[in-house]
Regions:
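Phosphate-backbone binding interfaces of nucleic-acid-interacting proteins
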Residues: 1-185
Length: 185
């Protein structure tokens, strides 16, 4: 069973951090495997809007994108993803950001064009296995007002601690979030 600490806090105020809550669960007869931190390590990856997207001369797949990343002047980013288009909201790693795989973003020339960041897929951010193209965020913001320039983890509520609990046969009552909240209360 995976218990989201943030979701749990919608039901109760645990009064302790996720690690201590895990120890309390263990004392109550549940077996805590681990506490996994999610959404951290994405500093410098922001919500951005692709303003323009033009094919790069001499390439069959590269595009030069002008991107509003909330940093004042628009960024110019060379992107090879097949699904990039003008008007999209995307995840943009700005110069200096270090992605979960340890890759640090820097200004780089590609085919003679300066790229000032990287438009990222979910796999590059360590969030999912999808590497088919960049992560398009259109539709994630219900009111239509996207927080351009905001860290992606904060904007999408990705920062959480997940308690991974191995349920024993005598604790099937904790197969649901409400009973996990009751156990923590």
């Amino acid at each position: 069973m995976q218990v989201s600490y943030n979701w749990l806090k919608e039901y109760i105020d645990p009064g302790v951090d996720a690690a201590e809550l895990g120890r309390l669960y263990t004392a109550a007869g549940l077996e805590l495997d681990e506490v996994v931190s999610r959404g951290r390590g994405l500093e410098g990856v922001v919500v951005a809007r692709v303003l323009t997207c033009d094919p790069v001369a001499g390439s069959d797949h590269l595009h030069l994108c002008t991107v509003d990343a909330g940093r004042g002047a628009p960024l110019h980013i060379v992107c090879g993803a097949p699904n990039v288009a003008a008007g999209q909201l995307v995840a943009c790693a700005t110069v200096g950001a270090t992605l979960p795989g340890g890759f640090t973003i820097s200004e780089k020339k590609t085919m003679g064009l300066l790229s000032q960041g990287m438009l990222c897929s979910q796999k590059e951010l360590g969030l999912a296995d999808d590497h088919s193209g960049i992560w398009v965020l259109d539709g994630y913001f219900a009111d239509g007002t996207a927080p351009v320039g905001m860290d992606i983890a904060s904007a999408l509520g990705l920062i959480d601690d997940v308690l991974v609990i191995e349920l024993t046969p005598n604790r099937s009552d904790c197969l649901g979030m409400l009973n996990c909240a009751r156990e923590a209360a």
